[in-house]
Amino acid sequence: MTLDFALSQDAAVPAFTEEPVNPSPLAVSVRGLQRRYGARVVIDALDLDIREGEFVALLGESGCGKTTLLRALAGLDLPDAGQIRAPERPSVVFQEHRLLPWATLWENVALGHETTVGRAGAARALAEVGLSGREDDWPRNLSGGQAQRVALARGLARDPALLLLDEPFAALDALTRIKMHGLVKELVARHHPGVLLVTHDVDEALTLADRILVMRSGRIAASFQPETHTPQALRSILLEELGVQSL
């Protein structure tokens, strides 16, 4: 899927251009993306590539445009300018699990893809997230972590080329969050989608990502490869990029 949006004459030149280092095919490519809300520019001539199998974490202060970018990639928000080349229907997992309370777990997982996923595919996806045998259970019987596991199963049930994660672990307790991190890493390695994780948690980004981006004023301001730094050194760098004094 390619979406082109007319570029306004006053669009700024991108402040940061990424050079791909991974030979895998692109899962998504963004060029010159711009989004305005009235006079306020939320995304400013942004460029971004994510490759198949690459896990990218996006950090930034509240209001810098992270979620707006994710929604644009998901097709939930139309930019004012630029181009998006992305799978026609990427999968999205939000902070809230968004399960339908009147539908069983397998029906929630297969929602919108009943023909291609079906009960059998939903059962396999639920088994992958540790909920085997609970296909006919109801969302009301789940803990917060279990409900988010179902949301993740729904996101991966049809093997998407692009998986978008909008702070999916933010509402979970610390222990459940750690368990979910391990599960996500395992599932991404198995399914091999390109992943964009929007998060405020530097440590979460360090744990999960192959590449960490910092967004500032609607642009990608910095990009880091975790393997080129020690975790402690990169943590300090990222906190400084975010305007936080590290201890």
From Swiss-Prot:
Residues 28-242 form the ABC transporter domain. ATP binds at residues 60-67. It is found in: Cell inner membrane. It is an enzyme of class 7 (translocase). It catalyses: ATP + H2O + aliphatic sulfonate-[sulfonate-binding protein]Side 1 = ADP + phosphate + aliphatic sulfonateSide 2 + [sulfonate-binding protein]Side 1. Disulfide bonds: none annotated. It comes from Paraburkholderia xenovorans (strain LB400). The gene is ssuB3. It is a peripheral membrane protein. The complex is composed of two ATP-binding proteins (SsuB), two transmembrane proteins (SsuC) and a solute-binding protein (SsuA). Its EC number is 7.6.2.14. The lineage of its organism: Bacteria, Pseudomonadati, Pseudomonadota, Betaproteobacteria, Burkholderiales. One of its GO terms (cellular component) is plasma membrane. Pfam families: ABC_tran (PF00005). InterPro entries: AAA+_ATPase, ABC_transporter-like_ATP-bd, ABC_transporter-like_CS, ABC_transporter_ATP-bind, P-loop_NTPase. This is Aliphatic sulfonates import ATP-binding protein SsuB 3. GO terms for molecular function: ATP binding; ATP hydrolysis activity.
